[in-house]
Amino acid sequence: MPRENQKRGRRAAEKAEKDAAKRKREEVPEDSLPKRLKPSTDESTEINQGADYIPFDENYNENYDGNYDENQADAPAGDMPFYGLLDPEEQEYFSRANEVLELNQFQDAEERRIFIDSVYKEANGKELKIACSQGCSRLMEKLISMSDMRQIHRLFNKFIGHFMNLVQHRFASHCCETLFINAAPGVTQKVSKSKSDKMDVDEEEGEEPEPELSLAEMFIKVVEELEGNWGYLLTERFASHTIRVLLLVLAGEPVDVSANDSVVASRKKEKLGLPQGETQDGDVSAQKRSVPDVFEATLKKIMKDIVSVLDDTYLRALATHPVGNPVLQVLVSLELSHFGKSSAKDPNSITRRLIPDESFEEGSETTTFVRGLLYDPVGSRLLETIVRCMPGKAFKGLYKNFIRDQITSLARNITAGYVVLRVLERLGKDDLQNALERIVPQVPSLLERSRMVVPKVLIERCLVRGVDTAPLARALEEAYDKDPARRLEQILRLESTTQEDLEESEQKPKGANAAPSQSSTGEKLHGSLLAQTMLTAPGPISGLIYSSLLAQSSESLVKIAKDPTASRVLQQALTVPTSSAQFRRQFAPRFTSHLKELALDSSGSHVVDALWPATKDIFFIKERMAQELTQHEMALRDSFVGRAVWRNWAMDLYKRRRGEWAMKAKGIDNNNGSGERPKSRIELARAKFAAKAEEDAKKGAQKGVTA
């Protein structure tokens, strides 16, 4: 007889018991108090009221079942209120709405607006449930990002009175953050009625009263709700990022979540809202805004309250706290840049309490604290902010007494090196020259350790300050292979990528994902950025890259062009001002007979686009490339990136009106927008001679009159 299919062993039995307990928890309503449950298969086990409460554990489920207690005032002070669960039908509707917004297949903006209005009507009275729902909170974020100011105003009013709980919630905190960012531009605006409200004002009169408070007053209400809890919220896992946004909104500073150096949110944060290419009011979140005067007074009070409840020891401990450090960065940057660097002289200011001694003498308390931040992965980010924003006098003391003598060893360190970059950005010409002389001997070892960002920033600052880059060019040449072709492979990490691919294909088991390692991807990115920066420097530094590009074969160039990271170097080499006509005359023909392959590739198509401006003064090469593209018209039209290349090269104009295309290819039709042919050298000389003759004639006439 066939044996019953059973899993044996202690682990299988424990897993079966856990699954059974999980099913029972889903079927039976739990207590509405959000306590941390101990893993147990015994249903009779209960947690005592005196047990330690650890909020927002990783395994904590916000959407627990239970009845919503209307009288929240009688609830214990430390409890998180439960706003209820969505019905299965409601969850299904909002999930479908989320999918529709994600696909974004609306015919126009008006159709999307009507759909958003219908979702808001369905969500009326359920806003808090949706914000706290694991499955539907993303829909709330999308709705807020796509809403007009009137809808944001109404939603903000629904959240008033609940912000203390919402900002600490795993999912609702992100909705609060999105709400603050999108409501910020409206603090100085009068909310006008939208089209849908004007159309439905007769049919649905009195459906929902307009909020009495303005958006500015609502922000003040939020601050009043959170008042007295700042010290706790700074290090609260979910509330801290919302507090950062609130502080920046009150200051009128840009709140750009997408920026790489943003302290508002992690780089891994999911980008929700309008599709790419569509923005509301020109991406106002990344711009500075004017705010009411009451905001500045409120911000000062918040910062004063935060500092007053923290002693110096705890304040310095925040500098290395993973959650508290970003908030401290915002506070320091606002104190030094928004309120002026003179505010740092106040003995009770955050900067002064962190760094009481501006002389940075060896052995002092300040020096010990700064040295600890230098080598700490979290604390170094705060030190970067301090270096970027601190007053000039304090920066000079920091550089001369602490960093200058050890800048070489600091640049070699993977953590302290980023602080060195911020220091280099503030140095004057003489100090930068001195720092360059100290760092240049270490360039080969830096490149060997893949610390390519230090030479990159050195090149950029030398160009800005007018410092000679010849010593740096010699150091870069010595660091890489003498063979120009091999040099480019080493800079872009092409050879290491090929070896890794071969090893992975041999060693990886079948079915494993062939994802590149994060370290190799980062090295390739930094190598590409270094090469692009080298191309912007006139002289021997850019010559290292140009000679390497000319030494590559056509097959190698095609491989580089199809690499998403390395292809940027080719685009830069074709369009940067240091690219000479002689180089482009030799380099551009290397891509002929490969244009179809490149035009159909997502990365290579950008290189083909860059060939259009690069061949402006070598028309015969551009015409040869256009003929090659014409031969593969159907293949290009069947591809999304191919159609973009066809359009950017104006190939329809090439086929129908060859003469107009030739004028456009030579840049004639873009001459001051007049459509006139640019004058040749002989014509310019004639015009200059005629102007001089006319000027001499006028002078002769004036002399005759005076005589």
Curated annotation (Swiss-Prot):
Q: What is the residue range of the signal peptide feature?
A: none
**One GO cellular component term:** 90S preribosome
**One Pfam entry name:** PUF_NOP9
**Any one biological process term the GO annotation gives:** endonucleolytic cleavage to generate mature 5'-end of SSU-rRNA from (SSU-rRNA, 5.8S rRNA, LSU-rRNA)
Q: What does this protein do?
A: RNA-binding nucleolar protein required for pre-rRNA processing. Involved in production of 18S rRNA and assembly of small ribosomal subunit.
Q: What name does UniProt use for this protein?
A: Nucleolar protein 9
Family as reported in the entry's similarity comment: Belongs to the NOP9 family.
**Compartment(s) of residence:** Nucleus, Nucleolus
Do you know which SMART domains this protein is assigned to?
Pumilio
Q: Which portions of the chain have biased composition (kind: Basic and acidic residues)?
A: 1-27
Superkingdom of the organism of origin: Eukaryota
The entry lists its GO molecular-function terms as: RNA binding
Name the gene that codes for it.
Answer: nop9
Q: Quote the biased-composition stretches of kind Low complexity, using this chain's numbering.
A: 57-66
The cross-references to InterPro entries, in alphabetical order and at most eight, read: ARM-like (IPR011989), ARM-type_fold (IPR016024), NOP9 (IPR040000), Pumilio_RNA-bd_rpt (IPR001313)
Keyword Repeat on this protein? Answer: yes
Note down the stretches annotated as region Disordered.
Answer: 1-77, 268-287, 497-523
Key words of the record:
Nucleus, Repeat, Ribosome biogenesis, rRNA processing
The residues bearing each Pumilio repeat, given as ranges, are 122-157, 158-193, 365-400, 401-437, 548-588, 590-627
- Cystine crosslinks: none
